[in-house]
């Protein structure tokens, strides 16, 4: 099993990533040199632990956003996703296909002028038991 990382290691790695993200890579040796340059770390062992966890987090960041870490590129990507507007609005179509419950909800909210086509709900498949 792996070792448990201390709060100091995790916090230091997060700070290093937030401040120096463009310089960091997925390579431990490179990250070790960068951590050594940008931070004053008392021991070689602690420096290596911070560099190792930084490399681990960088690999996780490649797959998607990581909780607790925000840097400029990630913020810009999040803003871009939040500001996304589709080319054609779903409500601009001639008719919107909805079920009866959705039509009733639209009517109660005052959107009864939207042309809708009520479809019968699709029958749900029941699970088959193994024999």
UniProtKB/Swiss-Prot annotation:
GO cellular component term, pick one: cytosol
Keywords on record: Cytoplasm, Ribonucleoprotein, Ribosomal protein
Keyword Transmembrane in record: no
Entry's localization field: Cytoplasm
Any matching Pfam family: Ribosomal_S17e
Entries under SUPFAM superfamilies matching the protein: Rps17e-like
Coiled coil: none
Family statement: Belongs to the eukaryotic ribosomal protein eS17 family.
Misc. remarks from the entry: There are 2 genes for eS17 in S.pombe.
Protein purpose: Component of the ribosome, a large ribonucleoprotein complex responsible for the synthesis of proteins in the cell. The small ribosomal subunit (SSU) binds messenger RNAs (mRNAs) and translates the encoded message by selecting cognate aminoacyl-transfer RNA (tRNA) molecules. The large subunit (LSU) contains the ribosomal catalytic site termed the peptidyl transferase center (PTC), which catalyzes the formation of peptide bonds, thereby polymerizing the amino acids delivered by tRNAs into a polypeptide chain.
Assembly information from the UniProt record: Component of the small ribosomal subunit (SSU). Mature yeast ribosomes consist of a small (40S) and a large (60S) subunit. The 40S small subunit contains 1 molecule of ribosomal RNA (18S rRNA) and at least 33 different proteins. The large 60S subunit contains 3 rRNA molecules (25S, 5.8S and 5S rRNA) and at least 46 different proteins.
HAMAP family registered for this protein in UniProt: Ribosomal_eS17
Protein name per its UniProtKB record: Small ribosomal subunit protein eS17A
Species: Schizosaccharomyces pombe (strain 972 / ATCC 24843)
Taxonomic placement: Eukaryota, Fungi, Dikarya, Ascomycota, Taphrinomycotina
């Amino acid at each position: 099993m792996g070792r448990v990382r201390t709060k100091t290691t995790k916090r230091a790695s997060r700070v290093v990533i937030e401040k120096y993200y463009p310089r960091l890579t997925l390579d431990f040796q490179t990250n070790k040199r960068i951590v050594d340059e940008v931070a004053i770390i008392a021991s070689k062992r602690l420096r290596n632990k911070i560099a190792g966890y930084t490399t681990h987090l960088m690999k996780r960041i490649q797959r998607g956003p990581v909780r607790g870490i925000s840097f400029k590129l990630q913020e810009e990507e999040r803003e871009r996703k939040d500001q996304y507007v589709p080319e054609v609005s779903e409500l601009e179509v001639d008719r919107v296909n909805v079920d009866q419950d959705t039509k009733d909800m639209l009517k109660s909210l005052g959107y009864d002028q939207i042309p809708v086509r009520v479809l019968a709900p699709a029958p749900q498949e029941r699970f088959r038991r193994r024999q």
